[in-house]
Amino acid sequence: MPNQSITLRTIQSVTPDPHRDIYVWDHRLKGFGLRITPRGAQSFVFQYRVDGGPARRKTIGPVGSPWTPATARKEAERLLVQVYQGIDPVEAKREAKRKRRR
């Protein structure tokens, strides 16, 4: 799908493809997008690369309370800052979880 601004109207207008996930990428914020599954579930996602490595995706959360396009975009901005600092958000979360278990 083409890049567009992720808004409530965008979310309501996208119809699922019965055979594959659909991704709609935000044209204002690099890596921020919306994933729609074949069953119609919608989630905000963030796609990134750390130091030229492979592309990775992190699910921010499902569409709906508390995740609005605005709150999800702010979270994606926070994650983008981590990526620019060379921090992999997925690995940082895993490491924090490992430390809590010890």
Segments from the language model and where they lie:
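Basic/aromatic DNA-contact patch characteristic of tyrosine site-specific recombinases
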Residues: 1-102
